[in-house]
Curated annotation (Swiss-Prot):
Mg(2+) 2 binds at residues 501, 503. This is DNA gyrase subunit B. GO terms for molecular function: ATP binding; DNA binding; DNA negative supercoiling activity; metal ion binding. One of its GO terms (cellular component) is cytoplasm. The gene is gyrB.
């Protein structure tokens, strides 16, 4: 925990502006009024408790989803100040909950470091809740105040004596604001709670669900902090050295923590945080780390004669292959920029991170020559594969990005050139591809048949991936490029539809394609361009009429219902479609491709870390985690093709 700031009292609560606009324009303060915004309310309150932990005063935090989907957050910090705040003439706790930008975060007195720009937190949550109440446990007393839609109900009062210290906040999100949903997602909250436990070494933090039929509780506490985080991220991977490297230092009031470990895989996974906020877009702390890592490894390799004089320098891409790293900084005044305000902009952080990491990592390599040699050798192998991939890439470029005659996948393109209207169906097998070509709308639907199972990219290096014809044809058809040349704005289709058979092989091909998109074309997944077609599982024919039943866990019940509702004569016949090839072009269009009638599932990434681990477990080299997953989930299997 950081060095404690001085006393925390009413004089440290500063007021910047009023609260009127929050209910009129909630999106300006919490991003949206969808499920994302609803969950954001929780973090605004939790961040206040985390600030107490960062300052060294709180040791435990509890987050509770109450039976009515309201939220309670409990901490054992100092308790929000209850004295009179000079500017407002009201108790400090009331000021915190009723005045926008009031808090102990702006003057640097209450907190040396706080959770990003969350000074707006408490008052915004109050404004967007039908009711909120706060209990402050301080100086032997329990202080209580209640609010309705941001307005004070009663003056702050003492309701009992106590030997506890801390703050408890309970709020009910306002359904007038959150019109889409007021139902909390336990797993979503638990993921972030666990992340906060990793980022704040030694903190005890729990999440509990008290809703009927959903009761659950998870408690997190990691003495290893981000070192434990790296171990968690690499749980299903084969690592090159057993224990993650951990580096910590402080300069100019900026604390830098880095933990890293290499795996035998081909993908890097670098997560960066500033004041506990996940900086998805990176920033100066991440670039400082990357620059330093590349320079230190190259210097070490030359000094130890692990590379020859005329060997080409290892690039950043080379030294990051197979790397899992977490970079976490704490800064008194973080500046966030970028599209989603998740990119750290402070220029001094780059220098501090570079300097601190360089010093500690150089020392580590000198003291651990075996590990140092393993890291350099991995980088050199990556360099060879990169140069081979570069040659393959140049060959592909010379053929021209859109010369369809060069596509081994036999792309049947559409006539429209408007990417927003265009759809690319990736179809399993030539026979289904033929039906799809016949049945499609040629104006906006393109068909790319793929033969057999494509390469599992989770286990392959870039040069092997680019040598695979099916994958090359897909990259070329999309027009986005790949790897370092990838550009989502060049996508020729804004709907990429995976259309496979409803059997085990079809599911496998679908997973292989999703692995490819996630690992090498992730921006198209994040942009919402990837879909999975939902061809029917059954066709019930009676006379000239056909009723289709979609796949899903209730498919059998749906089929029984359809049969029950049909007249007994003429006798209906049931066909189970195992393959797309069993449908003619008219049926395929009607059931799976017609925008007016079809069902499609859009692929999204809600939790990138979990997605990363699932792909590694299902598609990676290690058998044990996969076997454990199968044993754990086998009882869910309903239809098994043997």
């Amino acid at each position: 925990m950081r060095e404690r700031a001085q006393e925390y009292d009413a004089s440290q609560i500063q007021v910047l502006e009023g609260l009127e606009a929050v209910r009129k324009r909630p999106g300006m303060y919490i991003g949206s009024t969808s499920g994302e915004g609803l969950h954001h309310l929780v973090w605004e309150i939790v961040d206040n408790s985390i600030d107490e932990a960062l300052a060294g005063f709180a040791k435990s935090i509890q987050v509770i989803i109450e039976p009515d989907d309201s939220i309670t957050v409990i901490d054992d910090g100092r308790g929000i100040p209850v004295g009179i705040q000079a500017k407002t003439g009201r108790p400090a706790v009331e000021t915190v909950f009723t005045v926008l930008h009031a808090g102990g975060k702006f003057g640097g007195g209450g907190y040396k470091v706080s959770g990003g720009l969350h000074g707006v937190g408490s008052s915004v949550v109050n404004a967007l809740s039908t009711s909120l109440d706060v209990r402050v446990y301080k100086d032997g007393k329990v202080y209580y105040q209640e609010y309705r839609r941001g307005a004070v109900v009663d003056d702050l009062k003492v309701i009992e004596e106590t030997d506890r210290h801390g703050t408890t906040v309970h709020f009910i999100p306002d359904p007038e604001i959150f019109t889409e949903t007021t139902v909390y997602d336990f797993d979503k909250l638990a993921t972030r709670v666990r992340e906060l436990a990793f980022l704040n070494r030694g903190l005890h933090i729990s999440i509990e669900d008290r809703r009927e039929g959903q009761e659950d509780k998870k408690e997190y506490h990691y003495e290893g902090g981000i070192k434990s985080y790296v171990e968690h991220l690499n749980a299903n991977k084969d690592v090159i050295f057993p224990e993650p490297i951990f580096i910590e230092g402080e300069q100019q009031d900026i604390t830098v923590e880095v933990s890293m470990q290499y795996t035998d895989g081909y993908h890097s996974n670098i997560l960066s945080f500033a004041n506990n906020i996940h900086t998805y877009e990176g920033g100066t702390h991440e670039s400082g780390f990357k620059t330093s890592l590349t320079r230190v490894i190259n210097d070490y390799a030359r000094k130890q004669k692990l590379m020859k004089e005329n060997d080409e320098k290892l690039t950043g891409e080379d030294v990051r292959e197979g790397l899992t790293a977490v970079v976490s900084i704490k800064h008194p005044d973080p500046q966030f920029e970028g599209q989603t305000k998740t990119k750290l902009g402070n220029s001094e952080v780059r220098t501090v991170t570079d300097r601190l990491f360089s010093e500690y990592f150089t020392k580590f390599l000198m003291e651990n020559p075996t590990v140092g040699k393993q890291i350099v050798e991995k980088g050199m192998l990556a360099s060879k594969a990169r140069l081979a991939a570069k040659r393959a890439r140049e060959v592909t470029r010379r053929k021209g990005a859109l010369e369809i005659s060069n596509l081994p996948g036999k792309l049947a393109d559409c006539s429209s050139k408007d990417p927003e209207k265009c759809e690319l169906f990736i179809v399993e097998g030539d026979s289904a591809g033929g039906s799809a070509k016949q049945g499609r709308s040629r104006e906006f639907q393109a068909i790319l048949p793929i033969r057999g199972k494509i390469l599992n990219v989770e286990k392959a290096s870039m040069d092997k991936i680019l040598a695979n014809e099916e994958i090359r044809s897909l990259f070329t058809a999309m027009g986005t490029g790949f790897g370092e040349d990838f550009d989502v704005s060049k996508a020729r289709y804004h709907k990429l539809v995976i259309m496979t058979d409803a059997d085990v092989d079809g599911a496998h091909i679908r997973t292989l394609l999703l692995t490819l998109f996630y690992r090498f074309m992730r921006p198209i997944v994040e942009a919402g361009y990837v879909y999975i077609a939902q061809p029917p599982l059954y066709g019930v024919k009676q006379g000239k009429n056909i009723t289709y039943v979609q796949p899903g866990k209730h498919a059998e019940e749906e089929l029984a219902k359809v049969l029950e509702e049909l007249p007994a004569s003429p006798k209906p016949s049931v066909q189970r479609y195992k393959g797309l090839g069993e449908m003619d072009d008219h049926q395929l269009w009607e059931t799976t491709m017609d925008p007016e009638k079809r069902l499609m599932a859009r692929v999204s990434v809600d939790d990138a870390i979990e997605a990363d681990q699932i792909f590694e477990m299902l598609m990676g080299d290690r058998v044990e985690p996969r076997r454990a997953f199968i044993e754990e989930n086998a009882h869910y299997v309903k239809n098994l093709d043997i």
